[in-house]
Design a protein with these regions (language model features):
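A charge-rich, low-complexity, intrinsically flexible signal that marks solvent-exposed coils, linkers
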Residues: 1-204
Length: 204
């Protein structure tokens, strides 16, 4: 795991995004989903693995409906500090636009296998403990492609059938339009409105 690609794309004198570092202990099992209104609105799904956030761009966002198979495109690893990043990436910078911490929490591997091994094998089975996403999920690589090959690395993000599954899931519902970190809407983040802290938020 490395942050070289992440750092090479960003001018940290211009963007408020964290430089971060690889944490060698690598024991944090946090996850974050960030709603990102850049050139196109999408959601970034990130899992703490080996001291960084393994990351995927999910164009339609995650779903709690097991019938939905969400495309997830692997992107560069991000620092663990990025899990708490919310704000505006300035125009002209990589990923310019609004970033919201849409969900945040912990995860546990479903199989008796470390997440880094599951990731290397192209099938990650986990249980999420977030505010919006809960229960079992599977990330599965669609083709034997590596980011090192220079081609896009396509995966599918699928909700497992359990007590948390919701066949009526609608990610655009007003129930899900606020940050779990600050309580702000995308519009309020863009306008730089102050956070609306509350008790019980997840810590990473």
């Amino acid at each position: 795991m490395s942050l070289a690609a992440y750092r090479s794309k960003r001018a940290f004198t211009e963007t408020p995004e964290p430089v971060g570092r690889v944490r060698r202990s690598g024991r944090t099992r946090a996850f974050v989903v960030q709603k990102h209104d850049a050139s196109r609105l999408h959601y970034d799904f990130r899992l703490a693995v080996n001291g960084v956030l393994a990351s995927w761009a999910v164009p339609k966002g995650p779903s709690m409906n097991p019938a939905d198979k969400r495309l997830a495109v692997r992107t560069e690893d991000h620092p663990l500090e990025y899990a708490k990043f919310e704000g505006m990436i300035p125009p002209g910078q990589y990923g310019a636009g609004i970033v919201m911490v849409w969900d945040l929490g912990k995860y546990e591997p479903l199989e008796n296998q470390p997440p880094e091994e599951q990731l290397a094998l192209g099938k990650v089975q986990i249980v999420l403990q977030g505010e919006k996403l809960r229960g079992g999920f599977t990330l599965i690589q669609t083709k034997n492609r590596s980011m090192n090959s220079g081609r896009r690395d396509y995966w599918l993000l699928i909700k497992r059938r359990d007590e948390y599954a919701d066949p009526l899931w609608d990610i655009d519902s007003a129930r899900f339009d606020r940050s779990v970190l600050t309580g702000r809407s995308m519009k309020e983040i863009k306008e730089g409105k102050p956070a609306k802290p509350r008790l019980g938020r997840h810590r990473v």
